[in-house]
């Protein structure tokens, strides 16, 4: 096994997880902040806002999980070796 390929795979795995976490992290923070603001403005719509928020947070978190899957594939099922 080429050590350069192994080192590049480890670096790519770290970048995959790190970069895949930035966007959803910012999006989740923004969505949660807007949900709290919406509930503060209209308390009677809390259930609807909360349900929509939880669904959107799940979709955003899926992006991070995809990055983790790519990183695990690079580390343990490396197609470049």
Curated annotation (Swiss-Prot):
TM spans (from-to): 7-27, 57-77
Keyword set, alphabetical order: ATP synthesis, CF(0), Chloroplast, Hydrogen ion transport, Ion transport, Lipid-binding, Membrane, Plastid, Thylakoid, Transmembrane, Transmembrane helix, Transport
Tagged with keyword Cytoplasm: no
Any matching Pfam family: ATP-synt_C
PROSITE patterns given in the database record: ATPASE_C (PS00605)
Entries under InterPro entries matching the protein: ATP_synth_csu_bac/chlpt, ATP_synth_F0_csu, ATP_synth_F0_csu_DDCD_BS, ATP_synth_F0_csu_sf, ATPase_proteolipid_c-like_dom, F/V-ATP_Csub_sf
Family annotation (HAMAP family): ATP_synth_c_bact
Similarity comment: Belongs to the ATPase C chain family.
Something else known: In plastids the F-type ATPase is also known as CF(1)CF(0). Dicyclohexylcarbodiimide (DCDD) inhibits ATPase.
Name of the protein described by the UniProt record: ATP synthase subunit c, chloroplastic
Native species: Arabidopsis thaliana (Mouse-ear cress)
């Amino acid at each position: 096994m080429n050590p350069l390929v192994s080192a590049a795979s480890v670096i790519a795995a770290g970048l995959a997880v790190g970069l895949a976490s930035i966007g959803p992290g910012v999006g989740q923070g923004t969505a949660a902040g807007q949900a709290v603001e919406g509930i503060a403005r209209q308390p009677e719509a809390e259930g609807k806002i909360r349900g929509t928020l939880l669904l959107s947070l799940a979709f955003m978190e899926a992006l991070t999980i995809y990055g983790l899957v790519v990183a695990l594939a690079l580390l343990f099922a490396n197609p470049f070796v």
